[in-house]
């Protein structure tokens, strides 16, 4: 390729310029570069003329390989855009090649070429022959002129067929070119090229069947494709018959039959008729008269069934030909001595089976079967009368003396029809041979011996030599018993009595058997003759004996008939079963053998396929490598040639030879080319720069020299312009004066006609004034009418507009009234709902107040009873302090001695006033938050789905009853106990302490026990518990904090919480199941988990727990005994996991809406919430400790499992601790510590779905969670 790139239009102009000066090769190179260029791979309109010019040059220069490469490139360019352009280009290319070949043929006198193969024009034999014999001028002219063009045309056909194969878009063009190639072979008698063309077409068809998955592949199931292929194959068959290439014709027949098999629909009758006609010719030329006749039979039946316009003459001609062809089939079997010796019967049978398949027959035909079909279909009635009796003479009648004379008449008639029926002449020799054979068969049945001259006189249409040859062939192939005696010139028949005829001996007219047949059947004939004689001469006694024997036989038969019948049936059944068993065994064995053979064949086939695949892969790899090498060499050569064309490139590569291309590297060539381009660019820049300087100097000098000249020329031009202006001005003044004089003359002449003009105008106005007044009057009348009409229409329109406006206003008023009515009804309904809610709130507050009063009284009674029981217990336990001395000796392991006082945080507070102040206003609202409503299903009211603790009162609990009838424990509180009451006597929840800041109770993940009413001493709820609600349906919880509290909806129909505030209540869910925030009245500060307790004492651990502001980890004092130790530890681990931020927007933390501050929106309960909660937790904790002491006293001392645990100590030590605690002054409550911390309890749902939160704490300790 050149260093520069040309546009296609410029390349075409450049090529035409080369052609004008007679340079075809440079023009071809220019067009070749454009076609090979990768920058124009998209088809454009200019590509077609470029390609036509390129192919024209290829034809003129006979460059078939360049034409092939260009066509392939053009196919890639236009295949997806304009395939019609490719068709036009290919047709134009072939047309040019054909015209050039025809021109060369006209100039040459050689009509038929003597060259066998155009691919190998000069064979060694032809070279030697030309050297020995020499050649004249004409022969040399023919060889140099016609042969190259014929070869070029053949290569053009072959290249175009390879280009267009297996492409559905150009399928029609492909078949047209194939048919043109057949005509070319027929025109120039190119047999070798015809064979190659047939092989190529067969190979292309195989490729179509293999590569049918390609995008442009031909679909052989398409009827149009099948018809085009059949048409091409029929042309091939016709050409092969014309060129007498019978082997190729037979292959074409097989190809046509294969196409028939591919087609799902039957072929057209016209196509099948043409096919049968061609096949019959092929069979006759191959010497197979049997299948030739069978083909004519098929053609005859097809014509009778499908042709509606079949004339009587055509039917007569076809039936006559079928009759002659059938009778012309040789009577003797077509088998030579060599075939008999080599045992080729199987091969012959297989050949006949294949030929029968080509005709669509299930089994091969025979001569006798064809004759029977001819008789069965009554074909003889359509035969011409001259030939009609030929069948009877040869196949039915037995008349040897007149046979040849009758047949001679028919043969003479056939010869006379040579001009009309030329196809019938080919049957005459075969009919003569069959007639001679029939004559010999019939003569052999009559005569024992006959003279040769006598026999020759019976066969007038052959000479003696042919007759003798026929006799010998009949004796050898036809089982004819004949001997020729040349000494006496006689023939003897049936002289060999030991001769036995074969099974396939021909059958014909029969009179009697031969002597050998009589000798072979002599005993049978003698037996039948003797039986007849005995029947004639035997006496009556013999007949009577025979009758008696017959009667005895009948009697015996009747006696044993049934048994014999059963035996025969049984034997038949046995035979059938045995045959079936043998047959099944044979079938099974054959099946196994078949499977084994198939497996072996499959294995061999797979191995062969794998081998072929590997070989193909290796060949493909080798081919790709060779192509890459060739492309590399070609690229190196092209680049080297391009660089050498330049001056610098010639200097750089002057020492490199083209033959050394294998050692060159394309990168090296590219580097050289780039270097050469850079040098050229630099040289050009320097040259331009020097020229620029020269031009600048020259231009400056030139302008300096021309300045005075320009001034001088300017002055001269100015003087000339002034003179010209003065001259023109004088001429203008003179012309104006002349024009004024002419105008004055014209005015004087026209003024004389002014009077006539005035008179004419006055007459015209007088005549037309009346018409004007009439038209004006009519116009005024029409104007008045039109004005009235329009005013009336305007009035109607205004009236219609007012009516529409009135109705529209009326509808709007009605709509407004309806909306006001709906608004009033909605406001009234909201007012009634508000009143109802307020009434329910007042009733709820009243009921709550009564319940609080009742609970207060009950709590006082309980305190008095518990105090009394405690004192009795202390008095009873006092004498038993000494035996428990051993428990006090382990102080170093964390147990407190009896003499020690209780810890400060357990010591009761002396005065009771500070515990009770403000209690009346807070106690019941707090109760509302600490108690949950009645829950259906019997499950625990406080425990969630993730509660891992056991039941508080399980069936396997070994502790004593809580408050049974036989419980001897004293009451929990006395009358002087100033602590707040627990919610029930046997509340089994973990005790709360004064500094206990655990999170609020929750629904699903709360691990604390359920709270109970005052008088409920039952265990926790279970799944099958059918007890009543915890607090009854008169739930005494406080009212909701506000109208817009965003708590969740009610849980069910039996929910006894306070009423909803209205239809627009947007509160969140109740805090029983999924409320993740703390409840009102609880301490919102989180607890801090402790580590594993060390070896210190009880007070040290309690002090550490108090400092951590969290519940104890290792000393959980609840009523579950030792079974709670592991649970407490696991709960300590889960506390860390559940400490996460609660969902934002929970308005229960702020006491109202979430928008304002906490002080303005909190309710009346929030002021002293924390003091009351801390007191209540401390009271419940003390009550739990006393109950545990009583239980331990009953069970006796236990062996401590964990020295660091405080829940295993005896009751005596704990009583001492409680005494010390009561005597010690109370610790100041740290109620405001860690007020900014938030509760971090989480439910399982919260653990699974963590959310990003932001917590804010106000002055009162309320935490607001924002999203």
Swiss-Prot record:
Top-rank taxon, per record: Eukaryota
Compositionally biased intervals (Basic and acidic residues): 792-835, 844-1086, 1098-1147, 1162-1256
Protein's cellular compartments: Cytoplasm
Stretches of the chain forming a coiled coil according to its record: 82-118
GO CC annotation, single: eukaryotic translation initiation factor 3 complex, eIF3e
SMART domains: PINT
Keywords: Coiled coil, Cytoplasm, Initiation factor, Protein biosynthesis, Repeat, RNA-binding
GO molecular-function terms, A-Z: mRNA binding; translation initiation factor activity
GO biological process per UniProt: formation of cytoplasmic translation initiation complex; translation reinitiation
Gly residues: bias regions: 1150-1159
Region of interest (12 X 10 AA approximate tandem repeats of D-[DE]-[DE]-R-[GP]-[GPQT]-R-R-[GPS]-[ADFGIM]), residue spans: 956-1073
Sequence repeats: 956-965, 966-975, 976-985, 986-994, 995-1004, 1005-1014, 1015-1023, 1024-1033, 1034-1043, 1044-1053, 1054-1063, 1064-1073
Family matches, as PROSITE patterns: PCI
InterPro entries: EIF3A, eIF3a_PCI_TPR-like, PCI_dom
Positions of the PCI domain: 315-498
Keyword Coiled coil assigned: yes
Residues covered by region (Disordered): 792-1267
PANTHER family per the UniProt record, alphabetical: EUKARYOTIC TRANSLATION INITIATION FACTOR 3 SUBUNIT A, EUKARYOTIC TRANSLATION INITIATION FACTOR 3, THETA SUBUNIT
Biological role stated in the UniProt entry: RNA-binding component of the eukaryotic translation initiation factor 3 (eIF-3) complex, which is involved in protein synthesis of a specialized repertoire of mRNAs and, together with other initiation factors, stimulates binding of mRNA and methionyl-tRNAi to the 40S ribosome. The eIF-3 complex specifically targets and initiates translation of a subset of mRNAs involved in cell proliferation.
Subunit and interaction comment: Component of the eukaryotic translation initiation factor 3 (eIF-3) complex, which is composed of 13 subunits: eif3a, eif3b, eif3c, eif3d, eif3e, eif3f, eif3g, eif3h, eif3i, eif3j, eif3k, eif3l and eif3m.
Similarity comment text for this entry: Belongs to the eIF-3 subunit A family.
The protein's name: Eukaryotic translation initiation factor 3 subunit A
Organism of origin: Danio rerio
């Amino acid at each position: 390729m050149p260093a520069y790139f040309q546009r296609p239009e410029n390349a075409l102009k450049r090529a035409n310029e080369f052609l004008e000066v007679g340079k075809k090769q440079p023009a071809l190179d220019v067009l070749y570069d454009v076609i090979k260029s990768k920058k124009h791979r998209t088809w454009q309109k200019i590509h077609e003329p470029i390609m036509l010019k390129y192919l024209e040059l290829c034809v003129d220069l006979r460059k078939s390989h360049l034409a092939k490469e260009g066509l392939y490139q053009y196919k890639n360019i236009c295949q997806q855009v304009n395939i019609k352009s490719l068709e036009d280009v290919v047709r134009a290319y072939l047309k040019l090649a054909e015209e050039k070949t025809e021109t060369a043929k006209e100039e040459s006198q050689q009509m038929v070429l003597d060259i066998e193969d155009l691919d190998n024009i000069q064979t060694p034999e032809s070279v030697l022959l030309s050297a020995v014999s020499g050649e004249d001028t004409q022969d040399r002219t023919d060889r140099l002129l016609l042969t190259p063009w014929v070869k070029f045309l053949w290569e053009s056909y072959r290249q175009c067929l390879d280009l267009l194969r297996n492409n559905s878009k150009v399928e029609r063009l492909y078949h047209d070119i194939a048919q043109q190639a057949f005509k070319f072979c027929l025109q120039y008698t190119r047999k070798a090229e015809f064979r190659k063309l047939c092989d190529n077409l067969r190979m292309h068809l195989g490729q179509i069947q293999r590569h049918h998955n390609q995008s442009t592949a031909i679909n052989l199931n398409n009827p149009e494709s099948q018809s085009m292929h059949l048409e091409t194959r029929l042309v091939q068959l016709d050409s092969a018959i014309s060129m007498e290439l019978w082997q190729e014709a037979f292959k074409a027949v097989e190809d046509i039959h294969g196409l028939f098999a591919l087609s799902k629909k039957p072929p057209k009758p016209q196509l099948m008729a043409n096919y049968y006609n061609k096949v019959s010719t092929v069979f006759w030329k191959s010497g197979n008269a049997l299948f030739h006749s069978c083909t004519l039979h098929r053609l005859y039946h097809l014509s009778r069934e499908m042709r509606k316009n079949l004339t009587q003459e055509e039917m007569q001609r076809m039936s006559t030909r079928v009759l002659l062809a059938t009778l012309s089939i040789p009577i003797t079997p077509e088998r030579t001595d060599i075939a008999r010796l080599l045992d080729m019967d199987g091969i012959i049978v297989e050949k006949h089976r294949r030929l029968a398949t080509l005709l669509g027959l299930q089994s091969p035909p025979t001569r006798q079967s064809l004759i029977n079909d001819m008789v069965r279909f009554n074909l003889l009635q359509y035969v011409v009368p001259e030939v009609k009796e030929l069948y009877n003479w040869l196949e039915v009648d037995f008349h040897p003396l007149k046979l040849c004379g009758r047949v001679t008449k028919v043969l003479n008639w056939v010869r006379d029809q040579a001009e009309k029926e030329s196809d019938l002449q080919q049957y005459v020799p075969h009919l003569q041979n069959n007639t001679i054979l029939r004559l010999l068969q019939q003569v052999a049945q009559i005569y024992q011996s006959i003279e040769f001259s006598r026999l020759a006189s019976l066969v007038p249409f052959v000479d003696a030599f042919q007759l003798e040859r026929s006799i010998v062939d009949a004796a050898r192939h036809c089982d004819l018993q004949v001997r020729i005696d040349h000494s006496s010139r006689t023939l003897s028949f049936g002289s060999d009595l030991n001769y036995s005829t074969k099974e396939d001996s021909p059958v014909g007219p029969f009179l009697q058997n031969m002597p050998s047949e009589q000798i072979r059947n002599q005993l049978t004939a003698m037996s039948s003759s003797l039986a007849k004689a005995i029947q004639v001469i035997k006496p009556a006694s013999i007949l009577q004996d025979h009758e008696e024997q017959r009667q005895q036989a009948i009697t015996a038969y009747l006696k044993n008939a049934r048994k014999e019948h059963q035996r025969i049936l049984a034997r038949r059944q046995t035979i059938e079963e045995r045959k079936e068993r043998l047959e099944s065994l044979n079938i099974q064995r054959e099946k196994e053998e078949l499977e084994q053979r198939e497996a072996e064949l499959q294995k061999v086939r797979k191995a062969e396929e794998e081998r072929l695949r590997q070989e193909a892969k290796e060949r493909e790899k080798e081919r790709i490598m060779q192509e890459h090498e060739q492309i590399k060499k070609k690229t190196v050569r092209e680049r080297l040639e391009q660089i050498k064309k330049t001056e610098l490139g010639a200097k750089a590569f002057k020492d490199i030879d083209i033959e050394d291309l294998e050692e060159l590297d394309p990168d090296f060539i590219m580097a050289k080319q780039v270097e050469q381009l850079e040098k050229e660019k630099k040289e050009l820049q320097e040259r331009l720069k020097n020229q620029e300087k020269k031009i600048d100097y020259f231009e400056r000098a030139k302008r300096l020299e021309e300045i005075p000249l320009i001034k001088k020329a300017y002055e001269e031009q100015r003087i000339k312009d002034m003179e010209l202006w003065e001259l023109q001005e004088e001429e203008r003044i003179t012309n104006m004066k002349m024009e004024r004089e002419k105008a004055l003359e014209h005015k004087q002449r026209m003024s004389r006609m002014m009077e006539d003009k005035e008179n004419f105008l006055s007459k015209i106005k007088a005549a037309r004034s009346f018409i004007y007044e009439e038209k004006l009057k009519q116009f005024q009348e029409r104007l008045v009418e039109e004005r009235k009409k329009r005013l009336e229409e305007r009035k109607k329109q205004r009236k219609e507009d007012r009516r529409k406006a009135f109705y529209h206003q009326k509808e709007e008023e009605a709509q407004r009234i309806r909306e006001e009515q709906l608004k009033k009804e909605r406001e009234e309904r909201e007012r009634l709902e508000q009143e109802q809610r307020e009434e329910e709130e007042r009733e709820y507050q009243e009921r709550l107040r009564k319940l609080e009063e009742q609970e207060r009284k009950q709590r006082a009674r309980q305190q008095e009873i518990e105090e009394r029981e405690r004192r009795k217990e202390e008095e009873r336990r006092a004498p038993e302090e000494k035996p428990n001395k051993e428990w006090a000796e382990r102080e170093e392991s964390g147990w407190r001695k009896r003499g020690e006082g209780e810890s400060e945080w357990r010591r009761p507070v002396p005065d009771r006033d500070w515990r009770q102040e403000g209690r009346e206003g807070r106690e019941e609202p707090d109760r509302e938050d600490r108690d949950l409503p009645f829950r259906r299903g019997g499950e625990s009211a406080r425990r969630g789905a993730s509660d891992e603790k056991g039941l508080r009162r399980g069936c396997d609990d070994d502790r004593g009853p809580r408050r049974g009838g036989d419980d001897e424990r004293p009451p929990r509180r006395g009358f002087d106990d100033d602590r707040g009451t627990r919610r029930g006597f046997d509340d089994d929840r973990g005790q709360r302490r004064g500094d206990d800041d655990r999170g609020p109770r929750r629904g699903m993940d709360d691990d604390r026990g359920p709270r109970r009413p005052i008088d409920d001493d039952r265990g926790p709820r279970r799944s099958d518990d059918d007890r009543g609600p915890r607090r009854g349906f008169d739930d005494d919880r406080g009212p909701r904090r506000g109208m817009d509290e965003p708590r969740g909806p009610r849980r069910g129909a039996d929910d006894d919480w306070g009423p909803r505030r209205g239809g627009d209540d947007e509160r969140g869910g109740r805090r029983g199941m999924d409320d993740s925030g703390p409840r009102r009245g609880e301490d919102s500060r989180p607890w801090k988990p402790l580590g594993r307790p060390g070896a210190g004492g009880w007070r040290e651990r309690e002090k550490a727990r108090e400092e951590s502001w969290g519940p104890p980890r290792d000393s959980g004092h609840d009523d579950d005994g030792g079974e709670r130790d592991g649970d407490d530890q696991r709960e300590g681990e889960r506390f860390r996991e559940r400490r996460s931020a609660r969902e934002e927007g929970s308005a229960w933390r702020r006491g109202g809406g979430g928008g304002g501050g906490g002080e303005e929106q909190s309710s009346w309960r929030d002021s002293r919430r924390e003091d009351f909660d801390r007191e209540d937790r401390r009271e419940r904790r003390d009550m739990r400790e006393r109950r545990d002491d009583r239980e331990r006293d009953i069970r006796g001392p236990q062996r401590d499992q964990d020295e660091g645990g405080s829940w295993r100590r005896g009751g005596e030590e704990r009583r001492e601790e409680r005494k010390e605690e009561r005597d010690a002054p109370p610790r100041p409550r740290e109620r405001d510590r860690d007020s900014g911390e938030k509760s971090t309890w989480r439910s399982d749902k919260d653990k699974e779905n963590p959310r990003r939160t932001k917590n804010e704490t106000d002055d009162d300790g309320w935490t607001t969670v924002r999203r």
